[in-house]
Amino acid sequence: MPLGVLLTAIVGLGALSIDMFLPSLPTIAATFATSAATTQLTVTLFLAGLAVSQLFWGPLSDRLGRRRVLIAGLTVYTLAGAACAFVPGIRALIAARIVQALGAGSGPVIARAVVRDLYEPARAARILAGMGTAQALTPILAPIVGGWVHALAGWPAVFLVQGGFGAVFLLTASGVVPETNVYAGAPASEPTGRRLATLLGHPRYLAYVAVAALMFGGQFAFITGSSFALIGVLGVSPTLYGFCFAAVATGLMAGNFVSVKIGQRFGIDAMLRAGTMIGAAAGLLMAALAWVGVASVASVIGPMFGFAFGLGFVLPNAAAGAIGPFPRMAGLAAAVLGFVQLTGSALYAVAVSQFHDGTLRPMASAIAAAGVLALTASGRVRKT
């Protein structure tokens, strides 16, 4: 497996771990006789663990190197993923998912840091967008595969498959990942706290992080709410749900593909602005349809395709713009970006889940609000 393929795969490790078992959420809730909100904690707390762990893996990779840190993280992910299949109750499943997330956090932060190690910002944005195009296959295929595995062998088998993927990535990383951090092993020029203060005092860095976090928050409101909206409210089957989710992921793939083709011509900031404009318009359309009483698969998936298309512009360009100016602390810069993006999304999704009322309105309104706020935040990038 070439290095680029592995980096693309591990960037999507979190998405794989979430999207693959989304069709199983209602069954897991029924199996353990618990509520939808409690079951959704297996998603939202996974996301929180994924976010927090990046603050550990990123700075550690700045000091010790990318390769060793990635191998350690993938080992944790593989073992915890398999353990999820054998839990006796919902609390144990939530705990195992948190540990799985701690390992998964090594993937995206190390992959982005490696790209920064190897390329300057404009080229890095193109590389990340290209990785995103391929990575978008994860949310397309994962729910479909998860739905099939669930139908054939039950939800525990979904986690065994995740553990198997982790083992493949671990063995591959051991063979193909070089050490790209030229500063690995050198004494730190300044303490981590001071380097963190440098990042948080950089207005453009904060603006890029805010845009990425807000747009991803809208996407995650769909990720956590879509199974209950589409299966619970609209009555689609778990298998059909997988194809609906895949249609949205196709929007993300298309956005990434277009970003690869035109991103270097227009620049990071212009692509960011365009992506947030598309996201805001799509979110407002979904909310308007929900509030006038239109409740159909098309009224959800159509606008969400557009939102995901805009997200495909935003994520690679926000990451390249945020991490690019900090070559000596690319791991920390990538970690803070990932932490804010994922923690904000988890908190947003938890808040949205509390307003579940058996309609599409809470989810649609949350997606619209995220798009509008991201558009507003993108204006700060232009002013700093």
Per-range role (PLM):
Residues 31-33, 65, 86-92, 103, ...:
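Helix-breaking motifs and short loop linkers at transmembrane-helix boundaries and internal kinks
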Residues 52-91:
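Conserved MFS/SLC helix-loop-helix module at the cytosolic interface between two early adjacent transmembrane helices
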Residues 68-82, 163, 271-286:
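Structural signature of the two symmetry-related core transmembrane helices
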Residues 76, 80-83, 91-99, 298-304:
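Paired small-residue
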Residues 92, 121-122, 129-175:
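Helix-loop-helix hairpin linking two adjacent transmembrane segments in secondary transporters
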Residues 96-136:
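Cytoplasmic helix-loop-helix junction between adjacent transmembrane helices
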Residues 180-209:
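Juxtamembrane intracellular "pre-TM" segments in multi-pass secondary transporters
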Residues 321-357, 366-367:
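A late C-terminal transmembrane helix in Major Facilitator Superfamily
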